[in-house]
């Protein structure tokens, strides 16, 4: 496992478990190694943003694809990223990076924490609470994150069609509505 120093240990600001970003980067790197695309496409960030994230949380870590632009995002991914940034309550580079990563990984098929490579849902919720406090507060009912994102988007009167993922056919439906 990759080990990352906590850049907030001696400075002000939100405290984010650097290990969580290690899991996310490791997941992206595994997918790159498996031929699923460049790291920029796996995490939804430009190479420059990946380099800045690396410099902040994992100085010296070798990352591929740092010369690539940010991949184009589809409408669902853009809507989720906009929602996250709007609800976040903070305007930091770290919040912007995490919003892009969460939106991109929300396009995958499993639970968001699994698609991020995190050990459990509480890791995801804890990272969001530290990094995107307004988003965490908005999810007061502790709804599963992907479901929460789509419910928030679909509740907007401007949306006439919502492509929310269907839970009824999922084998893990009971787990989604169980306490953490």
From Swiss-Prot:
GO terms for molecular function: molybdenum ion binding. Keywords: Molybdenum, Nitrogen fixation. The keyword Protease does not apply. Signal peptide: none annotated. It holds the Pfam family NifQ. InterPro entries: NifQ. GO terms for biological process: nitrogen fixation. Probably involved in molybdenum processing. Belongs to the NifQ family. This is Protein NifQ. It comes from Rhodobacter capsulatus (Rhodopseudomonas capsulata). The lineage of its organism: Bacteria, Pseudomonadati, Pseudomonadota, Alphaproteobacteria, Rhodobacterales. The gene is nifQ.
């Amino acid at each position: 496992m990759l080990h990352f120093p906590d850049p907030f240990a001696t400075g002000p600001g939100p405290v984010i478990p650097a290990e969580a970003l290690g899991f996310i980067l490791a997941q992206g790197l595994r997918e790159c190694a498996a031929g699923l695309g460049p790291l920029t496409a796996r995490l939804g960030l430009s190479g420059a943003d990946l380099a800045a994230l690396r410099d902040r949380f994992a100085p010296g870590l070798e990352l591929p694809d740092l010369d690539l632009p940010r991949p184009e995002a589809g409408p669902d991914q853009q809507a989720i990223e906009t929602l996250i940034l709007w609800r976040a309550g903070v305007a930091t580079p770290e919040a912007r990076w995490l919003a892009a990563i969460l939106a991109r990984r929300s396009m995958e098929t499993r639970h968001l924490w699994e698609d991020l490579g995190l050990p459990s849902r509480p890791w995801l919720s804890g990272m969001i609470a530290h990094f995107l406090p307004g988003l965490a507060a908005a999810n007061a009912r502790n709804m599963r994150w992907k479901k929460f994102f789509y419910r928030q988007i679909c509740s907007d009167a401007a949306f006439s069609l919502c492509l929310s993922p269907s839970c009824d056919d999922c084998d893990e439906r009971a787990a989604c509505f169980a306490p953490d």
